[in-house]
Amino acid sequence: MNFNSLRKEIFSNNASVKELVNDIFTNIDHKDPEINSYICTTKDNAIAQAENIDKLIQFKEKLPPLAGMPIAIKDNICTKGVATTCASKMLKNFVAPYESTASSKLWSSGGICLGKTNLDEFAMGSSTETSLFGVTSNPWDINRVPGGSSGGSAASVAAGFCAAAIGSDTGGSIRQPASFCGVVGLKPTYGRVSRWGLVAFASSLDQIGPITNTVSDAAEILYSISGKDPFDSTCLDKPVPNYLTHLNKSIKGLKIGIIKECFEHPGLNPEVKESVLSGVDRFQALGAEIIEVECPRFNDGIATYYVIAPSEASANLARYDGVKYGYRSNDGSNLIDMTSKSRAEGFGDEVQRRILIGTYALSAGYSDAYYKKAQKVRTLIRKDFDNAFNKVDVLLTPTCPTTAFLKGDFVNDPLSMYLSDLLTVPANLAGLPAISIPCGFDTKGLPIGMQLIGNVLEEDRILNAANIFEIDAQVIKNRPSF
């Protein structure tokens, strides 16, 4: 299911928008219990939105750009009047009193909200196994994880439960599940899309972006949700190009940098390496110039990230104290006791682990050794990228070291789980745009993702390269059956 196929259905009078939306909900009702991609659906609201679009079509009114396109929203993004739980007991009953800027722009552009998708609690995870609402399954193999933290969004797109979904990416949470589920996942430049209404995890790293079946659909959504926002001081006041106009440009002469350190890492699965290198050969055949580059501190990104992100999380999550909103424990003889028990009962194990790591890294006597040093390494990682982009236009890596792993494989081994973000976190630390696209399958039939990283605000360039590759390679010929 993609935007072009849906538009053909609608404008050939084969089906009304309302009929298409009803069909999707029927599919969700029958099949999503096996996948568990949605936390909740918003059928009544979606039908009302669909009827409005049908009226515009009937009376030949001008249609907004995303008219009738069914979209799901990750459940850490606020949607007015609908529960925004972050898959946590802490926010299980929280109903957002306002709409996020990104989702508001989608609905203004004619998109239809199908519901809220599952995630790792507070977006802290790489498998969508830490959700209060249960584990999400990978549509390609329901015994495996879809990745995380935007696993529900990626799984819903791959399974055909929506045409597109919105996720958030702090260290790879859009791109990693996109790779595991065989779909397209785009993390924009930091500040390209407003974070207003995104529940904060690590504020200097978080970014909202699309998960779709095609690169062109990702380009459409990015165009709709980008732009300056007075509610977010970190949102960039820069012109937003129409990304669709750049998609089909020739990539002859495009300089693609292959990051040496990524392909030499001992944790890289041989099948993943082989598939991505085949993708490199395809780019070369399409006219791109392939250049090996070095980013000496690229592999230091994971250690740097797991100091900075938990540190910011420990500060951001301090607001959940059981007083103003969120879960409140009924036990406790005084305020301190009540707050302590509310947080202990309201947060899951992984969230508590990261809060403790962050609090330790920021504590007196340790912040110089850990947090400040991590910030210095972050600057060096960005300098490595700057040096690389002096030589090339786009950087290329595998998205993940492996394909989707079995449920439960790393539940008791968080360090191994963290390593699944090895190749994605550097782009977040540097604030750069990056996209994951399918490039092949392993011998188990599981999708493999390839990552393209661009310079600041050069989403048009990575979207162009990704689109040319997608059209030529035709990797995903059939969607998973389950």
Curated annotation (Swiss-Prot):
Which chemical reaction does it catalyze? L-glutamyl-tRNA(Gln) + L-glutamine + ATP + H2O = L-glutaminyl-tRNA(Gln) + L-glutamate + ADP + phosphate + H(+)
Which key words are in the record? ATP-binding, Ligase, Nucleotide-binding, Protein biosynthesis
Enzyme class per UniProt: ligase
Protein EC:
6.3.5.7
- Signal peptide bounds: none
Q: Which GO MF terms are attached to this record?
A: ATP binding; glutaminyl-tRNA synthase (glutamine-hydrolyzing) activity
**GO process terms (BP):** translation
GO cellular component terms, alphabetically, are: glutamyl-tRNA(Gln) amidotransferase complex
Highest rank taxon of the organism: Bacteria
Query: Disulfide connectivity?
Result: none
Residue positions of the active site: 74 (charge relay system), 149 (charge relay system), 173 (acyl-ester intermediate)
**A Pfam family of this chain:** Amidase
Q: Which family does it belong to?
A: Belongs to the amidase family. GatA subfamily.
Q: How does this protein assemble?
A: Heterotrimer of A, B and C subunits.
- Say what the protein does: Allows the formation of correctly charged Gln-tRNA(Gln) through the transamidation of misacylated Glu-tRNA(Gln) in organisms which lack glutaminyl-tRNA synthetase. The reaction takes place in the presence of glutamine and ATP through an activated gamma-phospho-Glu-tRNA(Gln).
What protein does this entry describe? Answer: Glutamyl-tRNA(Gln) amidotransferase subunit A
The encoding gene is gatA
